[in-house]
UniProtKB/Swiss-Prot annotation:
Annotated binding of 5-amino-6-(D-ribitylamino)uracil, by residue: F23, A57, Y58, E59, A81, I82, I83, F114
Stated family: Belongs to the DMRL synthase family.
PANTHER family per record: 6,7-DIMETHYL-8-RIBITYLLUMAZINE SYNTHASE, 6,7-DIMETHYL-8-RIBITYLLUMAZINE SYNTHASE DMRL SYNTHASE LUMAZINE SYNTHASE
Residues holding (2S)-2-hydroxy-3-oxobutyl phosphate: G86, T87, R128
Gene name tied to this protein: ribH
InterPro entries for the chain: LS, LS/RS, LS/RS_sf
An example Gene Ontology biological process: riboflavin biosynthetic process
GO terms, molecular function: 6,7-dimethyl-8-ribityllumazine synthase activity
Catalytic reaction(s) noted: (2S)-2-hydroxy-3-oxobutyl phosphate + 5-amino-6-(D-ribitylamino)uracil = 6,7-dimethyl-8-(1-D-ribityl)lumazine + phosphate + 2 H2O + H(+)
Record's keyword terms, sorted: Riboflavin biosynthesis, Transferase
Active-site residues from the entry: H89 (proton donor)
Taxonomic superkingdom: Bacteria
Protein name per the record: 6,7-dimethyl-8-ribityllumazine synthase
Amino acid sequence: MQIIEGKLQLQGNEKIAILTSRFNHIITDRLKEGAMDCFKRHGGDEELLDLVLVPGAYELPLILDKLLESGKYDGVCVLGAIIRGGTPHFDYVSAEATKGIASAMLKYSMPVSFGVLTTDNIEQAIERAGSKAGNKGFEAMSTLIELLSLCQTLKD
């Protein structure tokens, strides 16, 4: 039996985009910082890293689709923060963002990591953006790095 898995190390020539929503920027800024830290720690070249900002999580799928369609990127790390409020808006935005991101990834068969927080309150979001529960932006970039490696291994 052969075990095939990705490595947590960039080759240094991968072109990566971090796609981040600005809404709830207190959280998404920390996620973005975590993703950038992970990228640097694992051999990424900052000259090959683009940061793309959109107004909110609902806009992430459209711009992800455009980034993947461009053919300029080897992978995209998608970050956002959707925090439940008093209306059904949370349910609609989180469902459509999630479906749209997955759809774009499968449409282009490209590595995409999902670092969009969906939390019940601001405290949970803060915990996942660098406090008690680690930094989900860092984790999303780690996932992308492994996916890039695994896809390359499967291609060879």
